[in-house]
């Protein structure tokens, strides 16, 4: 796992994701609209429950070049699935980017980016990697194809399917 430090300050309200955010085709970023992402974290390092308690965090410590490329693309208002790695291997919550990615001030190289996110809500039930792999709709999903990647895009269809699975 490549992520490091999480959890810093608190933010007042934590809006929830509404259904109308997943009804558009997967061109949101190209048209300046909402994009969808999945961020991975080891729950023993920084669980979604800790994130909720903190109210906000900066997503730091991402070293992989492709994950950094994705992180640099995150914009204010984008939605993020929070994924627990390790023994859990499941999407457990939803967060929202409160600003666009920016250079990580703690990175001595001056090349790595970070983004500030706030929790929106915990999923009704976690959606496991095994469930995702078992569903052919997710064949092209980076979580299935490039499993070690810690920051990845999520298509609108994948987002909607995971949301649906979390409610069943």
Q: What do these predicted regions represent?
A:
Residues 22-32:
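N-terminal, intrinsically disordered charge-dense segments
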Residues 30-76, 166-168:
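Compositionally biased, charged N-terminal/linker segments
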Residues 33-43, 104-168:
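Contiguous surface segments at macromolecular interaction interfaces
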Residues 81-82, 96:
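Hydrophobic beta-strand signal
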């Amino acid at each position: 796992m490549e992520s490091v430090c999480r959890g810093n300050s608190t933010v007042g309200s934590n809006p929830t994701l509404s259904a109308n955010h997943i009804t558009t085709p997967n061109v949101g970023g190209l048209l300046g609209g909402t994009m969808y992402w999945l961020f991975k974290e080891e729950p023993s390092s920084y669980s979604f429950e800790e994130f909720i308690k903190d109210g906000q965090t900066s997503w730091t410590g991402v070293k992989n070049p492709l994950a950094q490329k994705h992180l640099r693309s995150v914009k204010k208002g984008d939605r993020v699935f929070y994924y627990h790695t390790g023994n859990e291997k499941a999407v457990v919550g939803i967060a929202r980017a409160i600003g666009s990615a920016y250079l990580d001030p703690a990175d001595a190289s001056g090349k790595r980016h970070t983004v500030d996110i706030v929790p929106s809500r915990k999923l009704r039930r976690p959606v496991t990697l095994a469930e995702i792999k078992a569903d052919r709709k997710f064949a092209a999903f980076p979580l299935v194809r490039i499993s070690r990647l810690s920051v990845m895009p999520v298509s609108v269809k994948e987002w909607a399917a995971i949301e649906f699975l979390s409610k069943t």
